[in-house]
Amino acid sequence: MESIPLSPFDLQGSFSNIPYAFFYENTQSENDFMPFDFLKGSLWASLQRFPILTGRLRARSTGHIVVEVDAGNPNQPDIRETLCDSVHWSQLKESSFAWDAWPAGVATVGPVATAAADGEIKLLNIHVMRLAQNSGVILFINIPHYVVDGVGYFAFINHWAETMRMQQQQQEQENEARSRFSFDRGIIQRYLPTERAPLDPLTASIYGQRNLLVDWLAWLSPTTLGGLLSKTAAMARGEAHLFRIPRASLDQVHKDVQPYIPASARLSDNDLLVALISKTYIQSQPQPKPPTGFLSWLRPGQGQPESHCTVRIPCDVRRHLKVRERYTGNLLLGMMVRTPLAELARPTSSETLAAAALNVRQSIERVQPGLVAAYHDLIQANPTSHMRPLAFTATRTTTSLVTTSQVRFPMYEADFGSGKPCFVCLTPVFAGSYTMAAILPTPEGREGGVYVLLTSNVEAMQGIKKNQYWNGLVEIIW
């Protein structure tokens, strides 16, 4: 048996699931389109390279979790196949794959990792749903954040697809070195530098300040924590929409903000998108009074109104640490972008958007090896602190949000032998009342612009859809 201790990076949001659905059209009307036996057989072969996905989560001490991998007694993935006679591929295509057009039951898990019938949290859930008249397949795949981030998730999906494709063609897979993946958490320590850079005051405060309620959550086992958080997640009601920003519109925004930024500055698409989403969100709703009663316990400085908007941006730090291995565990640093509410509330124009985007750029440029090391040390020294961001977000539901850019993920590469997916998207379990924006690639790649899958509370979403500047840039897909 192998015991894999999860790293401080693994514990950030570890209880949340990564639930995507991949849509495949049976263009050739193949009778054996993506056969289940082949999917299942190639899955077991693929797991030889990803044994951690057959492990069991175990709490070893306060705030410390390990994955126990027993090759002789694996934690079997939940893989199932169903047939949906009521929904044809053409219906999904006509609706632009809108969530409300999906057949019921595509996602077999919720937003939080919970125990299955056997009492274990499955580290891999797969649902193969065949559409009416064998017109296509929806492939739902979920992996909890405990063991992978987005890089690791798509590395597994694409490896599985390649394995099945090679098996169908009766070919050997490409050289072993290329398909070698690492889940050794010890890699992180080897790449951390000796120097340390100071964390920003907010991050240091969130993780360094004890909070009895959320620290207590870190004492719970993964199964108990999942059961508790899933009940609270079920109470959250929000509204979600998929927007598209065409490439031409993004390019025009870059040109329009140019006069308002220093000649040496270079803004990325993501800088502009985070700024645009933040401004549109803050302008969408009135700010409530600070929380009182029970929720006020979660928040220091009771009774003080919030003066800043906080955007949490998960940054993949493999490049910053120069990690050479194909590491599949979590290596995300949650950068906090703080902007005065008054600044974001100013009507959006090229000038005000440029100012907000420069603030995003300056925050992201702080990511360096020394900062990554300081963040790692802080969580490691305070094992229960990984739950503390929950207290921050729970008391700032209208002034904080998460934006995650996934445009670099190879979402549309998973060809199981019958073609690549026509559409890939997070599932409706992503929707909630807390504001999150996932910036996704389109099937056309960079030339197609980007999708923005945005979920928020109902009041904010109504304001967002009425925002004049926002509507001038985006197309609402559904």
Curated annotation (Swiss-Prot):
A GO BP annotation: helvolic acid biosynthetic process
Claim: Transferase is one of the keywords in the record: yes
Enzyme Commission number: 2.3.1.-
Pathway: Mycotoxin biosynthesis
Assigned keywords, A-Z: Acyltransferase, Transferase
Induction: Expression is under the control of the secondary metabolism regulator laeA.
InterPro entries named among the record's database cross-references: CAT-like_dom_sf, Plant_Fungal_Acyltransferase
GO terms for MF: acyltransferase activity, transferring groups other than amino-acyl groups
Similarity comment: family membership: Belongs to the plant acyltransferase family.
PANTHER family: FATTY ALCOHOL:CAFFEOYL-COA ACYLTRANSFERASE, TRICHOTHECENE 3-O-ACETYLTRANSFERASE
Role description: Acyltransferase; part of the gene cluster that mediates the biosynthesis of helvolic acid, an antibacterial nortriterpenoid. Protostadienol synthase helA cyclizes (3S)-oxidosqualene to (17Z)-protosta-17(20),24-dien-3-beta-ol (protostadienol). The synthesis of protostadienol is followed by several steps of monooxygenation, dehydrogenation, and acyl transfer to yield the final helvolic acid.
Name of protein: Acyltransferase helD1
